[in-house]
Amino acid sequence: MKMGKEKKAAVDGPIYDARTLGTPKMLILGVQHLFAMFGATVLVPILTGLSVSATLLFAGLATLFMHLVTGKKVPVFLGSSFAFLGGYFGVVASGAELGLSQAEALPYACVGVACAGLLYLILALICKAFGSKNVMRFFPPVVTGPIIIAIGLILAPSAINNCSTNWWIALVAIVVVIVCNIWGKGMIKIVPILMGVLASYLVAAITGNVDFSGVKDAAWIGLPVAMQNTVFGLFSSGSVNTGLLVSSIIMIVPIAFATMMEHVGDISAISGPIEKNLIEDPGLHRTLIGDGIGTTIAALFGAPANTTYGENTGVLILTKVYDPKVVRIAAYFAILLSFCPKFAALITAMPAATIGGVSIILYGMISAVGVRNMVENHTDFQKSRNVIVAAVILGLALGVNFSAAGAISFAIGNVNIALSGLAIASIVGIVLNAILPGKRDEYMPNEENSGSLGKF
């Protein structure tokens, strides 16, 4: 009788070892965890033109690598990052001016993302050497907040363009996402993006607005990575455009400053519910290494940048199952699905209006997260220096991006370099905050809320 009471208490309270639930329940929890991450993870490759199969494969592999690096102590899933969308779009636009197709230009963007991932390793080394707190003071919310706001605003026009293909289908997605997020209960509240996509996709299919021919022709089993879509394929082609390559790196790498702040916020947020200080053990330097190398490897093989997911925290709070093994099960399922081209074709067939509908909310939420980042960290806009830093970042990021040229271009020798507004704003903002007189604000990660750019 006593054993029965102990077992019931264990189920009702936090669970740190999911094996006590039995294998079937562990598998179900793993599938649930994957679906919580699924909506945003597959939406990024759909928006950018990258491979859905490669995305699932490297989301799973990156998650497993993160767990390996952190000693299997951190219950985190790595999925696709929305923060780099502007970088992908910018490189594709630059490639189009040179006569390159989207498929030909995307590997150049992947080079930039791979380099951005390496920046995580540099920060990890610095954190290990000098301590996380000393490093984060150079990236306070008055810098990262406006950058995040600009990311969302720059992406917003593409969402409207997608919605314009069929506003009724887009509205279904928007309404369902809002209803699930505001009035949903349990797991429904955790996966509003997935619910919005499924509902809108279903309505589009019923009304004849979906072309399933690609799904019919796709094989059930196949390799998730095509060599011609990878960075290796780019360099083996023998026709690399050096100017576009350098521009891609300069355009995309500064975005990592914002996503690294996102990483810190998410790791802090996970620490709260599981009642373990993950910043100290296994250490921020280890989680940064896992995220950074995961992003670099994914990009080299033509998959999007990875990021820690805020939905991850939501699922942990909902289920009270804090065992990292459950997250690893979700990773295994993601890898398994990546070898099914028919599944990827079903995702790719999704109407543009469905994508646009959920993107309106997602892109707006990115900007809202930037605002929240500053509010939660008590950024003082009574200080003139803070107003100037934020104003310059927003002015440069939006002004350059929406100017006639869309970038600031210059030549170094025979190499033409184009800097996006976001890249310029990030660099100038960090420098301004460092040199302007007055007391600088510090980054204070909130343990209850994360600033994820890869989540809803």
Question: Where do the language-model regions lie?
Answer:
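Intrinsically disordered, low-complexity non-transmembrane regions of multi-pass membrane transporters
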Residues: 1-28, 212-238, 272-279, 434-456
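N-terminal signal-anchor module of multipass membrane proteins
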Residues: 1-78, 83-103
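Membrane-embedded helical hairpins/re-entrant loop segments and their flanking transmembrane helices
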Residues: 15-24, 46-67, 251-324, 455
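Hydrophobic, membrane-embedded alpha-helices of multi-pass small-molecule transporters
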Residues: 24-40, 169-173, 191-192, 224-266, ...
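Short, non-helical or kinked segments that cap or interrupt transmembrane helices
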Residues: 50-55, 72-85, 135-144, 189-195, ...
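Membrane-embedded alpha-helical modules
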Residues: 105-213, 331-447
